[in-house]
């Protein structure tokens, strides 16, 4: 494995761990030339899954798009990178377990919203404001009211 800092091929593995319920191998590496440390991930190769966009176009499922969407929603929120990684990994696993060759962007968006709703309400509203493409302020307020009503019901059950 080439070092991303100096391009040397003299690197060694200093730590190996299984993550994502054993579906991913995480390796911590160190360059023997410059001393730089970096992390690599090994995932098994699988059949491509295509995301069907709103306009009907198809593109390969990209875990990084899910990760980046969650990162943006959680910016400046008390949600750790590890929690964000876990949410995106859980969504990826749900998509893979579905066994489908295609999945709609709507389904993926709903999965993200469900995870964010449980983790951080502000991040949820941020993501929803982009994902739901609010027509106007009233539509935005409807979503906030729904969230508040749901939280009240949950509090009453607890």
UniProtKB/Swiss-Prot annotation:
This is Transcriptional repressor NrdR. GO terms for molecular function: ATP binding; DNA binding; zinc ion binding. Negatively regulates transcription of bacterial ribonucleotide reductase nrd genes and operons by binding to NrdR-boxes. A zinc finger (unnamed) spans 3-34. HAMAP family: NrdR. Coiled coil: none annotated. PROSITE patterns: ATP_CONE (PS51161). Keywords: ATP-binding, DNA-binding, Metal-binding, Nucleotide-binding, Repressor, Transcription, Transcription regulation, Zinc, Zinc-finger. One of its GO terms (biological process) is negative regulation of DNA-templated transcription. Binds 1 zinc ion. The keyword Phosphoprotein does not apply. It comes from Kosmotoga olearia (strain ATCC BAA-1733 / DSM 21960 / TBF 19.5.1).
């Amino acid at each position: 494995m080439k070092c991303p800092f100096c391009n040397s091929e003299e690197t060694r593995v200093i730590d190996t761990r299984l993550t994502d319920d054993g579906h991913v191998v995480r390796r911590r590496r160190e360059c023997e030339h410059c001393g730089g440390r970096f992390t690599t991930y090994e995932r098994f190769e699988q059949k491509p899954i295509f995301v069907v966009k709103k306009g009907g176009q198809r593109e390969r499922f990209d875990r990084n798009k899910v990760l980046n969407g969650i990162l943006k929603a959680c910016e400046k929120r008390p949600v750790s990178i590890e929690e964000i990684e876990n949410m995106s990994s859980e969504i990826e696993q749900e998509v893979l377990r579905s066994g489908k060759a295609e999945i709609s962007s709507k389904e993926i968006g709903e999965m993200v919203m469900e995870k964010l709703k449980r983790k951080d309400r502000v991040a949820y509203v941020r993501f929803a404001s982009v994902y739901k493409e609010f027509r106007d302020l009233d539509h935005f307020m409807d979503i906030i009211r729904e969230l508040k009503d749901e939280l009240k019901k949950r509090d009453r059950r607890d």
